[in-house]
Swiss-Prot record:
GO terms for biological process: reductive pentose-phosphate cycle. Binds 1 Mg(2+) ion per subunit. This is Ribulose bisphosphate carboxylase. It comes from Prorocentrum minimum (Dinoflagellate). Coiled coil: none annotated. NCBIfam families: PRK13475.1 (NF010002).
Length: 1563
């Protein structure tokens, strides 16, 4: 499409030379450069200079010499009519052949097919090289190529195919090559049957018919034109986008033939016939259906099927429409020009576009004008457009808002160094707040978020919204839609649908100008803006301002605002799509407005008058008011207020009594003279013909002192240093819990805490609170009065019972800079951060936590819950009961088809299937093969059962981008069943950041929180971290729809019947925890998900304990272990619920629950089958069941005897059936050592083999359990097994079993080898994922009922697998270089943590940095420091930058700063990081990024590593002691934790002080 601007015909925009040069600057690896006159596209032999500019390090342009200084080259890509015969001369002109060829017809048009066509092109190059080397003697290039062709059949074939080119370039070729045939041969005669040899990789062969279309030069009218089609029928049919062009062929070309070639290039064709065309292809040809050669009119119908669609949601893409309709056709050699004058979208296709989400009606509402006929929004552009600094910019806003409504950034205003966004936006906010308070009216601001990088746009937008706070709706987002492209508009539309999207079209005139006969008109441009979602667009002033335009441009306004509107060629029905509001600017002032409104017919537009406001003689306030009066004067004249007078006279009459409009006459006298003849006499003006404009006295701005703030005097601190007993400061036992809750300003946390021997309880508790908030182990000189106001306070202790309660001010916790939301990682960093490794604390564990309502509202909470599942299942929204689900077993090892078959089998009787937590994108079961099988199974099961089905897909990954890619792929595959899909996130191993990724990016999906691995912290054995109760409670706060809660002692995992309180806390609106009552204030529930050894027999007692059955069951063995298969297993579980309900209702009289269930089973075969399958459970729970059910068989039956042959009934959806062998593994209780242990394996061989990750554990079985049997069960749960044999295991599955290869029961040592194929891989790039390694190695095995404890003490990664991880991108060497110490042995980097860790405000923080940097090298944020309200990042980081700059200048040495970017939301992390780098400017490399890797999870570390590889990645491990402490026999050691940090890419990690400091450790 570039030809619309770069064509020599077009005297606007830039040339093709400039366009391609810019591509190298912004990072293109290659760009299409045309063929320099040697192909079919426009061009000239001198265009070789384009190639030199792209590839050389120094190159001359038409005017300038450019030195590229080692910047990599951009490779020319040549295409457009090129074939083997044209190449030699092209290379000779260019001087080399180091280019990329993309020959369409040159390959697929070759008479012998694409293989020979490709070879012929390579031979074209070879022939030129040999001629150049003198191989053929002193002959012409033409003769040399012919000589080569004599012995090379493919090049010879090119002569026979492209004979016109041969005749022109190689005269006499026929005689030289001995060719005596016809002058034309049938092209595209490639025998497609040959492709059958490749059946293995392309699937079954397709019979193809030979093309019957003769090669008729470029006349393709027989295929690409059908003048019998009528526009009426095409519109009625609704399957085509219609486009009307003004098109002129080059001299000598037939109009219809050229039009058909135009349509061909715009759809399925090219300049020759090609062998790949088949019958279907022709069904999507674009067709010329109307031509008028005399008036150069041409209309083309494009089938909507031609256009690309999103893979994520099926929406339409405007870039695809434009790529076809004004793409390659803009540079065709036979077309003089072609420009779109109108375009029609059929309703069905139009609905696939976004359309506007907001419009002027939303502005009127904010301005208090209602929603109908709100009239003119009086706005301005801050002038000068560049050069104002932040305070003057804010003052200018304040001045205008005294009388006006709306201010926009001028399109180039953004984040210039002299007016940075983080300094300017706060000034705008202050001005808006002050103006609204003073005028009592709403005000509006349009902030420019345009950027090259969508991430930057999003970061800007979020920063602005955060600054705007409660005034966020008053903020529009301006996007320079022409220069940044439609992608930028879509970024704004889809990420911020609540904001008015202000489309600025600066630069459009390069294409739309009437002078330009390419591209599209301004009418078309603005029409497209409505389609893609602009709320408002600049439309020009229809000849009433200074820009190009015409009074007839009012049709643009009608097309943008009406629901049915006529364009030059087509009537468009918008079907209720919201309007796009015209924005008028460019020389407009109060005097020009009345006639503009009269031409348009209304005033429902937005005005942005720069000079019209700031040029007014009395200042911007009066300028704004004068514009509003211009509208009012027109309305009164229109209503007949001034009688039968001209509009001109009516406006003058109004001005007599309105000083501001009168002032506009005195200011803009030339306009007045032209539009209002005789105005001076009528207004009694006798002065000079011109007055001094814009004489506004800026001193008046001082009246606005209230909004810019007064200076603050700071007092010196009088706090003496008092060793470690900080109880006088960090404890206040007079505080009552009742008052703290009533006050609503504190998060309350209840701990079980024990000091080390010899330490005072209160003193230790106070030190704990100090380390958790503003203090440390000594008093520091930087503490001031404010700091103490945010101290955490111990308000209750009970040393005897080891109870301690701390109140944390909510102001302590970090907030998003993007939207002000709260962050759970900040809560955890403080409440279980460094306090988990304190030298005076034996242990400290959270047993309850209370969130005050005002703070709780800042968290997401769930967006979906079980109610949404019930609705899909057809059960209404109240009391829908048990959702019967399963986990596909084996958890790993199934390939895609068996996986789909297993889903289908279960869905015959069940509701819900979840991926097991390690299932993802393993090489043996890749997501792009597995998910389609799941979709087929779901569709078939829904059709057969007539009931909705649900699937929970695992999207967990280290990288949030990978998570989002997975989720979007899955939704795309699910299509109309997307709502049936939940997203599973391994929230413990991947961290809360991963949960937030899912919650905020996919709020319509049920968010399934899997907690595998949590037992490493929550286990009752572990006296650090938090309890399972707290863990699940926090899941509701951060937005989980459902979370695994254990089975309350009724399954195989750890737990207790009293765990039902977890369920109450998750589902009730008011619930009591061990210490606090939590009021949820209507926050949606988080549904308990129960799994782990559950089956139909265990369910009734579970429901009776809980009191209801409104939970989700995921029974693996309970379904797939059922003797009759998963369908009957699922039904049996539903019957387990039903039997409990009937017993509860008294159906079976006054009998025990046990007897009631047995009674039900007598008449229900599936539940009866559960008794026969799970006999040990039956014996334990239902004594005497055999007699009651009349069972006289053996005491055990073969489990999993499901007959897989039944699956063949589903052949339609699973494809060909696969023969399956019956399992020969006998059920040996939990002894799986015959399968999951092989003690003959040697470590040496395993390492040599390189296919296993080896993990060394200290593991102790529960009393009475065999060591090897327990170890094998541990390996089974960590890979492909479960607690029973299941019917889905096949031969392949066993090849990826984890194997115990060494045990030493006496020393409790166990080693397991995990095949690397077990671990999940990214779908985006195939990289490995640490969360997958941890999910298996310390996942469910951390809560097994037969394991007392199991902890990783070492881990080995084989080289081939290790290479799939990131590893560090930077290290201390990079720091030494900045510090001027070289790259070897640079020694100690002397750093500090700014203390107090919390409580310093920005200026004291910067002063503290400056003081340290006088002698030191490196400063880090303490891990909780972020964006607290008292020390916001946008105020603090500039102080750090000033301090760093000053210190570097004074000391002459580099300085380093590590900024904390940790957040729950990866988008927030990226926004913080980009903001900081922007502030750092040329000192960006001096900045490291700190991530709280333990509390935020490895996902957060990966966000930093992959998005900012040039920054030192500083891994803070606060909180790790909850797992790594020697006291804790679960999880992993500190050694393993730090080792893993290197694998995932940390540049540095806190390692403790090896006993030489205050934290735990050893030499």
């Amino acid at each position: 499409g570039h030809g619309a601007v770069t064509s020599p015909q077009t005297q606007r925009g830039y040339t093709a030379f400039v366009h391609t040069k810019l591509s190298r600057v912004i990072g293109a690896s290659g760009i299409h450069t045309g063929t320099m006159s040697f192909g079919k596209m426009e061009g000239d032999a001198s265009d070789k200079n384009i190639g030199f500019m792209l590839q050389d390090d120094v190159a001359d342009g038409p005017y300038y010499r450019q030195e590229w200084e080692g910047m990599k080259q951009t490779t020319p890509i040549i295409s457009g009519g090129m074939n083997a015969l044209r190449l030699p001369a092209f290379f000779e002109n260019l001087g080399h052949s180091n280019v990329i060829l993309t020959a369409g017809g040159g390959a697929f048009g070759h008479k012998d097919g694409p293989k020979q066509g490709a070879i012929s092109c390579a031979q074209g190059e070879e022939s030129w090289k040999l001629w150049k080397a003198g191989t053929y003697g002193d002959v012409s290039l033409s003769d040399g190529v012919v000589e080569y062709a004599k012995t090379h059949e493919e090049l010879k074939g090119a002569f026979l195919t492209f004979q016109k080119d041969a005749d022109q370039i190689y005269p006499g070729w026929k005689e030289k090559l001995g060719y005596t045939g016809e002058s034309s041969v049938q092209a595209a005669s490639f025998n497609w049957q040959k492709k059958d040899l490749a059946a293995a990789f392309v699937g079954a062969s397709t019979t193809r018919k030979a093309s019957s279309v003769a090669r008729r030069a470029l006349d393709q009218s027989s295929r690409y034109a059908d003048l019998s089609l009528t526009e009426e029928d095409l519109i009625k049919n609704g399957q085509h986008v219609l486009v009307a062009y003004i098109m002129k062929p080059k001299a000598g070309y037939d109009y219809l033939a050229t039009a058909a070639h135009f349509a061909a290039e715009s759809s399925t064709g090219t300049n020759v016939n090609v062998c790949t065309t088949d019958d279907f292809t022709k069904t999507v040809d674009a067709l010329v259906y109307y031509i008028d050669p005399e008036n150069e009119e041409m209309k083309i119908a494009y089938p909507t099927a031609l256009f690309d669609r999103n893979i994520t949601d099926g929406r339409a893409m405007m870039c695809s429409v434009l790529t076809l309709s004004i793409g390659n056709n803009q540079g065709m050699g036979d077309v003089d020009y072609g420009k779109i004058y109108d375009i029609y979208f059929p309703p069905q296709y139009l609905r696939l576009f976004d359309g506007p989400s907001c419009c002027v009606i939303d502005m009127w509402r904010i301005l208090g004008r209602g929603t109908v006929g709100g009239g003119l929004v009086v706005g301005t552009i801050i002038k000068p457009k560049l050069g104002l600094q932040p305070k003057p910019f804010g003052q200018a806003c304040y001045g205008f808002w005294q009388g006006g409504d709306f201010i926009k950034n001028d399109e180039p205003q953004g984040n210039q160094t002299f007016c940075q966004m983080n300094e300017c936006i706060p000034e705008v906010v202050k001005a808006m707040r002050a103006a609204q308070e003073e005028t009592g009216q709403g005000k509006l601001f349009s902030a420019n978020i345009t950027a090259d990088d969508p991430n930057e746009m999003i970061a800007r937008a979020k920063y602005i919204l955060n600054q705007m706070g409660p005034m966020a709706e008053n903020c529009a987002f301006l996007v320079d839609g022409y220069v940044a492209g439609g992608t930028a508009v879509t970024v704004a539309r889809r990420n911020f649908p609540k904001q008015f999207l202000h489309y600025h079209r600066a630069g459009h005139g390069a294409v739309t100008s009437p002078q330009t006969q390419r591209g599209y008109t301004a009418f078309v441009h603005t029409k497209l803006s409505r389609v893609i979602g602009a709320s408002g667009i600049h439309t020009g002033t229809m000849s009433f301002g200074k820009m190009e335009g015409d009074a007839s441009d009012k049709n643009i306004g009608f097309m943008l605002q009406d629901d049915v509107a006529d364009g030059p060629y087509y009537r468009q029905e918008w079907e209720g799509m919201k309007q796009t509001t015209p924005i008028i600017s460019g020389g407009m002032n109060a005097l020009r407005l009345p006639a503009f409104f009269e031409n348009l017919g209304h005033s429902n537009v937005i005005l942005t008058a720069g000079g019209g406001a700031f040029g007014h003689k009395d200042g911007p306030k009066q300028g704004a008011i004068s514009c509003a009066q211009g509208e009012e004067s027109w309305k009164l004249w229109k209503a007949g207020t001034y009688g039968d007078v001209s509009l001109s006279d009516g406006v003058v009459e109004y001005a007599k009594t309105h000083e501001e409009l009168k002032g506009a006459f005195l200011t803009f006298q030339k306009d007045a003279d032209q539009i209002y003849p005789g105005w001076k006499e009528k207004l009694g003006y006798t002065g000079e013909s011109s007055v001094q404009a814009a004489s506004f006295n800026w001193q008046k701005k001082d009246l606005a002192a209230a909004f810019v703030g007064a200076s603050t005097t700071r007092k010196a601190s009088s706090v003496a240093r008092r060793a470690l007993d900080q109880s006088s400061r960090y404890a206040d036992l007079s505080l009552t819990e009742e008052d703290l809750i009533k006050n609503g300003q504190h998060v309350l946390v209840a701990y079980i805490m024990k000091p080390k021997a010899g330490y005072d309880y209160l003193a230790t508790a106070a030190h704990f609170a100090a380390e958790s908030s503003t203090g440390t182990n000594v008093n520091v000189c930087t503490t001031d009065d404010f700091t103490k106001t945010v101290d955490a306070l111990v308000y209750y202790i009970d040393p005897e019972n080891e109870e301690m309660k701390i109140a944390y001010p909510t102001a302590l916790f970090d907030r998003n800079i993007t939207d002000g939301r709260a962050m759970m990682c900040s809560v955890l960093t403080l409440s279980i951060g460094n306090n988990q490794g304190m030298g005076d604390v034996d242990y400290g564990k959270i047993y309850d936590i209370y969130f005050p309502p005002q703070y709780l509202r800042l968290f997401d909470g769930p967006s979906c819950c079980v109610i949404d599942m019930w609705r899909i299942l057809g059960r209404g929204t109240v009391g829908g009961g048990l959702v019967v689900g399963t986990i596909i077993k084996p958890k790993l090892g199934l390939q895609p088809k068996p996986f789909g078959q297993a889903c289908y089998g279960f869905w015959q009787g069940g509701d819900f299937i979840k991926n097991d937590e390690p299932q993802g994108n393993q090489t043996f079961c890749q997501m792009n093969e597995c998910i389609p099988e799941v979709v087929k199974a779901m569709r078939a099961a829904q059709e057969e059962t007539g009931q909705g089905k649900l699937f929970s897909a695992n999207i967990t990954a280290d990288d949030p981008n990978e998570m989002i890619a997975r989720a979007k792929y899955i939704l795309n595959q699910m299509g109309p069943m997307a709502e049936n899909c939940a997203f599973l996130v391994d929230g413990y191993v991947a961290g809360g950041t991963a949960v937030t990724v899912a919650r905020r990016n996919f709020p319509k999906q049920f968010l399934h929180y899997h907690r595998a691995g949590h037992g490493a912290v929550t286990s009752p054995q572990t006296q650090r971290g938090y309890t399972a109760f707290v863990h699940t409670k926090l899941s509701r706060v951060i937005g989980a729809s459902g979370i695994h809660t254990g089975t309350m002692s009724f399954g195989k995992m750890e737990g207790d019947a009293s765990d039902k309180n977890i369920g109450f806390m998750l589902q009730d609106d008011v619930a009591d925890g061990p210490y606090y009552r939590q009021e949820w204030e209507g926050m949606k529930q988080t549904t308990p998900i129960i799994s782990g050894g559950m089956n139909a027999l265990r369910l009734p007692a579970f429901f009776e304990n809980l009191g209801h059955s409104n939970v989700i069951l995921t029974a693996g063995g309970g379904a797939f272990g059922h003797k009759d298969g998963p369908k009957q297993g699922a039904i049996s579980c539903a019957q387990g619920e039903e039997s409990w309900k009937l017993w509860k209702a008294g159906t079976y009289g006054d009998v025990s629950l046990s007897d009631g269930v047995v009674e039900y089973a007598k008449t229900h075969e599936e539940l009866k089958g559960a008794f026969l399958t799970f006999q040990k459970d039956a014996d334990q729970i239902y004594p005497g069941w055999k007699e009651k059910l009349g069972y006289t068989g053996e005491s055990s039956v073969q489990a999993a005897s499901f007959n897989w042959q039944k699956k063949d009934l589903a052949a339609a959806f699973v494809g060909a059936s696969t023969t399956r062998k019956a399992s020969s593994v006998a059920r040996r209780a939990l002894d799986q050592s015959s399968r999951y242990a092989d003690l003959s394996l040697t470590e040496e061989d395993l390492i040599k083999n390189g296919q296993h990750v080896l993990v060394a554990y200290i593991m102790k079985p529960k009393a009475g359990y065999d060591y090897l049997a327990t170890a094998a069960h541990f390996a089974a749960e960590s890979s492909t097994g479960t607690n029973v044999n299941v019917c889905t295991t096949d031969d392949f599955t066993k090849t990826v079993d984890a194997l115990v290869y060494y045990i030493d029961p006496e020393n409790e040592e166990m080693k397991i080898a995990y095949p690397t194929a077990l671990f999940d891989r990214n779908i985006t790039d195939g990289r490995a994922m640490m969360c997958s390694v941890l999910t298996l190695s310390i996942g469910n095995n951390q809560g097994m009922g037969d394991v007392d404890y199991g902890k990783i003490y070492d881990i080995y990664f084989p080289p081939q697998y290790l290479r799939l991880f990131d590893g560090p991108s930077c290290c201390v060497i990079d720091m030494w270089r900045i510090l001027g110490r070289g790259t070897v042995g640079g020694g100690l980097v002397v750093g500090t943590i700014i203390k107090p860790k919390l409580g310093l405000q920005p200026k004291p923080f910067g002063q503290a940095c400056y003081g340290f940097w006088q002698g030191g090298d490196f400063i880090k944020n303490d891990e909780p420091q972020g964006n607290q309200t008292f020390c916001q990042m946008n105020e603090c980081i500039p102080e750090v930058v000033k301090a760093m700059r000053a210190a570097q200048e004074e000391t002459g040495q580099g300085k380093l700063f590590s900024a904390n970017i940790t957040a729950d939301d990866p988008n927030e992390m990226i926004a913080r990081a980009k903001y900081i780098l922007n502030q750092m400017g040329p000192m960006a490399e001096n900045c490291a990024f700190l991530v709280d890797g333990y509390v935020a999870g490895g996902t957060a570390v990966t966000v930093a590593r992959r998005n900012f590889p040039k920054q030192f990645l500083h891994y803070h491990r606060a909180g790790h002691g909850a797992v790594t402490s020697p006291q804790t026999q679960r999880g992993y050691t500190a050694f393993v934790h730090t080792k893993l940090s290197r694998v995932i890419g940390a540049s540095g990690i806190h390692t403790g002080t090896m006993s030489f400091g205050k934290m735990e450790g050893d030499a």
